[in-house]
A protein has these predicted regions:
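Von Willebrand factor
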Residues: 1-29, 65-66, 71-72
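DG-centered beta-turn motif at the end of beta-strands
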Residues: 28-41, 85
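Von Willebrand factor type A / integrin I
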Residues: 50-108
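Alpha-helical structural motif
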Residues: 6-13, 48, 76, 96
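Charged helix-capping and loop-helix junction motifs
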Residues: 44-50
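Short, exposed beta-strand "edge-strand" segments with a Pro/Gly-rich flavor and a Y/T-containing core
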Residues: 3-8, 36, 86-91
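Short, local alpha-helical segments
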Residues: 33-34, 45, 58-62
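Extracytoplasmic/secreted cell-surface and envelope-processing proteins
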Residues: 41-44, 98
C-alpha cells in the first residue's frame, strides 16, 4: 500500500466511517478521535459527526492543540464540539493520563 504525506480530511474520514462501519456504532459505542480537528479548509462533514454522536454512547476527542487555537484558521473544532461528550487537550503522556481518568470518572 502506498502512503503519502497528505492533508487531514476529516470529512472523508467521517464518510468512510459511515460507509464502512456505521452499522457497528450504537448506544454501547464510545468513539474516540485523536487529532487537531483542522480540516485544511475542506468540508468537515459535521453533519456526519453529529449522526455518529446521536448513535453512539459517547464521543471523546483528544486534541493536541490547546483551547486558544480551537476555532482559528482551518480549525473545525467549533463545529464538532457541540456533539462531543468530552474534548480534552492531550499533548503529553500526563495529559493522556488525565483525559483517561476523566473518561473513566464519567463512566462512574
Amino acid at each position: 500500500r502506498e502512503m503519502g504525506m497528505g492533508s487531514t480530511d476529516y470529512g472523508q474520514a467521517w464518510s468512510d466511517l459511515k460507509v464502512n462501519h456505521e452499522s457497528i456504532i450504537d448506544r454501547r459505542t464510545t468513539v474516540i478521535v485523536l487529532g487537531d480537528g483542522r480540516s485544511n479548509y475542506g468540508d468537515p462533514r459535521a453533519d456526519l459527526f453529529r449522526e455518529f454522536a446521536q448513535r453512539a454512547k459517547s464521543m471523546i476527542w483528544l486534541n493536541p492543540e490547546g483551547r486558544a487555537l480551537r476555532g482559528t484558521g482551518d480549525s473545525a473544532i467549533p463545529r464538532y464540539l457541540p456533539f462531543c461528550t468530552q474534548m480534552s487537550h492531550v499533548a503529553t503522556l500526563k495529559d493522556l493520563e488525565r483525559a483517561v481518568d476523566e473518561v473513566l470518572a464519567a463512566y462512574g
